[in-house]
Amino acid sequence: FNCFNYHPPIIGFASSGWKDSVQNIIETGEFVWNLTTLELATAMNETSASLPHGEDEFFAAGLSKADSRIVNVPRVAQSPVNFECRLSQSLQLTTADGSPVDTWLVLGEVVGIHIDETLLEDGIYQTAKAKPVLRAGGPTAYYSISETHRFDLVRPDARAKR
């Protein structure tokens, strides 16, 4: 997942190959992004299994469903952060010469947000506190974010205003 726009918030992800997830999103026009934490990493990995069409990934991975407020798609109950999204675009990627590749980009506008309040300090989300997991360049490489690796950079335009 990545953030592509702030106002309105638009997030997206790429799917290598046509998967049920992409098909479901295109058919319903909705999806939920669920934060993967260190605690949920193994279950998240289980959701990538190639299951027979119609088999429930939640059940196979030992995850529970929670109702969303705005979209008609369940969210992962165990995830401390969920973004409810409406599909804005989906497209098959192409090479520079226009030849299609077997990867799909899905973009959605965030229309609802759920954040575990224990991850907020003075109304600001504390990323390291959630112990999020991110994919890191290979099919098996992941990293977890921790407070010890945090650093801040002030943008040049913001420095000029001081």
For each of these PLM feature ranges, what is it?
Residues 1-162:
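Basic, polyanion-binding surface patches
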